[in-house]
Amino acid sequence: MIEIKNIHKQFGIHHVLKGINLTVRKGEVVTIIGPSGSGKTTFLRCLNLLERPDEGIISIHDKVINCRFPSKKEVHWLRKQTAMVFQQYHLFAHKTVIENVMEGLTIARKMRKQDAYAVAENELRKVGLQDKLNAYPSQLSGGQKQRVGIARALAIHPDVLLFDEPTAALDPELVGEVLEVMLEIVKTGATMIVVTHEMEFARRVSDQVVFMDEGVIVEQGTPEEVFRHTKKDRTRQFLRRVSPEYLFEPKEHIKEPVI
């Protein structure tokens, strides 16, 4: 279980996160939705200390980390439990596809190159890129680059997968291939926290949907509660603007609840 308590973050005078609390059970998929500038990405980056919160506690496996004063050892430990899939891919341009996936295994996990190659090859096969092992990022489509990013995250076998708007930078025609890969990951029982603008994806796969605005959690609950039985006017206003059909038309929910 992951417990996040009272996360605050300021950039100058701008209070971006105002006391965020969230509990995520093992095997849950939590999607975070909301308008641009609401603090979603900053919150996600705080979870592995890519952004250092000004205040707050993160607990994983009963290990409690004070985000204001984490030791180097605690930062390293927390980053080993999590893996981030970035909106802009963050691939090394001078490395091949398989070298990009191997990087975290050989550098952070100190794995032998031969073993790292086998792991990376297996993960790339899972995301349908077994024929692109020796290609460079410049030779890939946006969807393929993001699938490399997903394979890289999966390769280190993290306890929690963090996705920062993984389809936001993609051509609309390429969004589907990335969402299909993510759906397959959901079916494995992975613990996932996903910042997304893909409302149908959020509704179909989530155990919890979290709606953020202006640095706070305005509303959270099951997809049924948030999309169909919305309690807060601000949430309803957002949903009507971005996805009005979800207030009126039920659709299939594919995620089995975590017991």
Swiss-Prot record:
- Give EC number(s), comma-separated: 7.4.2.-
Give the GO molecular function terms: ABC-type amino acid transporter activity; ATP binding; ATP hydrolysis activity
Q: Give me the segments passing through the membrane.
A: none
Induction of synthesis: More strongly expressed in the presence of methionine than in the presence of sulfate.
> Which residues does ATP bind?
34-41
Q: Where in the cell is it found?
A: Cell membrane
Domain ABC transporter, which positions? 2-239
Name the PROSITE patterns on file.
ABC_TRANSPORTER_1, ABC_TRANSPORTER_2
Q: Which membrane topology term applies here? A: Peripheral membrane protein
Q: What class of enzyme is it?
A: translocase
A Pfam family annotated for this UniProt entry: ABC_tran
Q: Where does it mainly reside? A: membrane
InterPro entries named in the record: AAA+_ATPase (IPR003593), ABC_ATPase_HisP-typ (IPR030679), ABC_transporter-like_ATP-bd (IPR003439), ABC_transporter-like_CS (IPR017871), MetN_ABC_transporter-like (IPR050086), P-loop_NTPase (IPR027417)
Alphabetically ordered keywords of this record? Amino-acid transport, ATP-binding, Cell membrane, Membrane, Nucleotide-binding, Translocase, Transport
Source species, domain of life: Bacteria
Gene Ontology cellular-component terms for this entry are: plasma membrane
The annotated subunit structure for this chain is: The complex is composed of two ATP-binding proteins (TcyN), two transmembrane proteins (TcyL and TcyM) and two solute-binding proteins (TcyJ and TcyK).
Q: Which family does the entry's similarity section mention?
A: Belongs to the ABC transporter superfamily. L-cystine importer (TC 3.A.1.3.13) family.
Q: What does this protein do?
A: Part of the ABC transporter complex TcyJKLMN involved in L-cystine import. Responsible for energy coupling to the transport system. Is also involved in cystathionine, djenkolate, and S-methylcysteine transport.
Q: What is this protein called?
A: L-cystine import ATP-binding protein TcyN
Q: Which gene encodes it?
A: tcyN
